């Protein structure tokens, strides 16, 4: 199994989990195709992490890309940046800028 992570990505975890659903239980080639046609920002980030995991597999163990499948995709919430938005009559409202930690694990098919 080969793992790649991206931490502190500026995308909401809830939206990233939607994009992660596109690649669960698929071969690496299918997952890359799904993510390349996705218009979500999280899809682009997950595709980079998936490419990194595949590169780890190819360089460390000489595993072919066609034999790999997505074993696990995890999207965890990272820290939040707290900002303030001005409101009427001198008020203000908190704004939470959410971040995500993305983890993709790929393995050989049949293991």
Curated annotation (Swiss-Prot):
A GO CC term attached to the entry: cytosolic large ribosomal subunit
One GO process term, biological-process aspect: translation
GO molecular function: rRNA binding; structural constituent of ribosome
Keywords: Ribonucleoprotein, Ribosomal protein, RNA-binding, rRNA-binding
Domain of life of the native organism: Bacteria
NCBIfam families: rplV_bact
Chain's role: This protein binds specifically to 23S rRNA; its binding is stimulated by other ribosomal proteins, e.g. L4, L17, and L20. It is important during the early stages of 50S assembly. It makes multiple contacts with different domains of the 23S rRNA in the assembled 50S subunit and ribosome. The globular domain of the protein is located near the polypeptide exit tunnel on the outside of the subunit, while an extended beta-hairpin is found that lines the wall of the exit tunnel in the center of the 70S ribosome.
Record's subunit section: Part of the 50S ribosomal subunit.
Sequence similarity: Belongs to the universal ribosomal protein uL22 family.
Name of this protein: Large ribosomal subunit protein uL22
The species this protein was found in: Chlamydia muridarum (strain MoPn / Nigg)
Gene name of the record: rplV
